[in-house]
């Protein structure tokens, strides 16, 4: 009874004599919002579970989605970045070339690099989706470890992307980012082949 009275007080339900209660219009809207939140939470948990797995197929699928999003992110960054942002991006990559040694440092640089480009895209939905895909620390360190074991020169790809963005050539920025993510996909595929985890 107390819970029902609280619902009445909050205008979520309304008593109809001795017949019981019905939801108000506000109550129906509120219920729909709760249902939407429940669905989003379920979707988020499923996606987080995928991000924490290390199977070849799941890593490849995550990288395929990243490729689509990050191509657009780089293209928009070439169009929308301020001069100050471009200078900072270039300085950050140039400084990192000589400083990075450990997996953690490389992973931190890689996160920062992709995060800066997403910021410069000026697309909030794109940025938040990429952040969700990129910022799984476990996944990111795994990808860095795989790339290092495959002998990848991670920063070489970054320099190409930066040069295209700083040159303000959207198509070149898109292509450079696509090639970068493709090399990551190839490294992951070759790594799993070597580990005999895929045929």
Regions found by a protein language model. Name each.
Residues 134-199:
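C-terminal all-alpha effector/ligand-binding and dimerization domain
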Residues 15, 101, 146-149:
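Structural signature of alpha-solenoid helical repeat scaffolds
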Residues 62-142, 158, 175-182:
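Conserved amphipathic alpha-helical segments that form helical-bundle/coiled-coil interaction surfaces
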Residues 61, 105, 149-153:
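Residue-level "hotspot" positions that anchor or transmit function at local structural transition points
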Residues 18, 22, 112, 172:
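Amphipathic alpha-helical recognition patches that constitute DNA-binding helices
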Residues 1-65:
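Short linear motifs at protein or domain termini
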């Amino acid at each position: 009874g107390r819970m029902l009275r609280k619902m009445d007080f909050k205008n979520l339900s309304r008593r109809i004599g001795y017949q019981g209660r019905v939801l108000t219009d506000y109550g129906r809207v509120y219920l729909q919002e709760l249902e939407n939140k429940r669905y989003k939470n379920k979707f988020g948990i499923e996606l987080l579970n995928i991000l924490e797995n290390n199977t070849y197929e799941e890593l490849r699928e995550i990288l395929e989605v990243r490729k689509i999003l990050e191509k657009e992110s780089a293209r928009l960054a070439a169009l929308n970045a301020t001069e100050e942002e471009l200078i900072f991006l270039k300085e950050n990559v140039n400084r990192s070339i000589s400083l990075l040694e450990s997996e953690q440092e490389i992973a931190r640089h890689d996160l920062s690099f992709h995060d800066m480009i997403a910021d410069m895209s000026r697309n909030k939905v794109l940025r938040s989706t990429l952040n969700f895909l990129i910022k799984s620390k476990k996944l990111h360190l795994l990808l860095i470890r795989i790339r290092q074991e495959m002998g990848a020169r991670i920063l070489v790809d970054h320099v190409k992307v930066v040069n295209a963005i700083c040159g303000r050539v959207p198509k070149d920025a898109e292509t450079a980012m696509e090639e970068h993510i493709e090399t990551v996909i190839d490294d992951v595929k070759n790594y799993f082949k070597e580990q005999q985890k895929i045929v």
